[in-house]
Amino acid sequence: MTAKPLHFPSRYTGPTVADVGERAVTLAIQRMAPSSRNGDDAAVLATPAPNTRTVVSTDVLVEGRHFSLNWSSAEEVGRKAIVQNFADIEAMGARPVAALLGLTMPGHTPLNFVQRLIAGMWDKTLQHNSELVGGDLTRADTLIVSITAIGILGGSSPALTLDRARAGQRLVASGPIGYSAAGLALLRHHGRTGIPAGFAPLIDAHCAPTLIPGRGVIARATGATAMTDNSDGLIVDLTTIARRSNVRIDLDSAAITPDSLLRKAGDHLGIDPWSWVLTGGEDHTLLATTTSDAPSGFRTIGRVHRTHAAAHVTMDGYPPTYTAGWESF
């Protein structure tokens, strides 16, 4: 079966990447995201300071699967690509310092689209005091954005790995939960232009999620032991921590109750907003376990207990109503 040709919105005008050629596209990217480390066969990064480690992560975004040009701008796709990759670095308690881009696209892709995509990436890398240091381009029928993020983990303390949650700790979160899923539901129902007023925070959370720089580093410095980001759904992501750590995580329903905006969206669409909170994912909110009080910028949303046969993740002591999440296959 032949794939349907990718359509770019009319706001992206001018020559295509096929018109100008690979070298001109590469030069345009370098101009939009200038870095002294970009432009050679490989990027040369400074040697990390003593008593530090390098952290690396990769995520791939596919048009039609992870984003849609029907409602996301090129800048938003670029911002989202960086945020979801840097969230993985932050979730280890590390600091993002660089990113590499792998980009596949059809020949009729407007050069202006690529420039705006890179502008979105550059905006987010600057927020984290990092750089886009290189990558690769190729032609394909599908628009695919792949980011490899590189970070630095300072000091000798362990990284915030998934297997270090312990009974007696509190579960803390930094950021919204359920907003991205609610935004996606609104977009699927209305498209970008038909959404009623007041839902902009939900749309923004899906199309261009935010990540406050340094939250993972702060959590690690103040006693957090395990951390992940809410990418595949709250229950799914917490179940991974619970299984790897051999504990049970009990959510406090009062701490994660859908707020007025989620309830309004749920009423509008006829969807239980709890499904967005528990299974939505793609908020890239940081979730951590700690023996200390909630770090700055975090709030307590549950407790860690010894494991038992009932479930790895419970809410107010009982199995949650919704347990699904994002899966690639």
Per-region residue spans from a language model:
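Acidic, Ser/Thr/Pro-rich beta/coil linker or hinge segments at domain junctions
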Residues: 2-5, 13, 17, 21, ...
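General beta-strand structural signal in soluble alpha/beta enzymes
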Residues: 37, 55-57, 131-135, 149, ...
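Extreme N-terminal cap/leader segments of soluble proteins
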Residues: 1-73, 92, 101, 116, ...
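Glycine-rich anion-binding loops of enzyme active sites
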Residues: 7, 61, 97-190
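Small-aliphatic-rich amphipathic alpha-helix that forms the alpha element of a beta-alpha
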Residues: 74-98, 119-127, 214-217, 233-241
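Active-site-proximal betaalpha loop/short-helix elements
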Residues: 108, 203-280
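Short hydrophobic/aromatic beta-strand micro-patches
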Residues: 150, 287-291
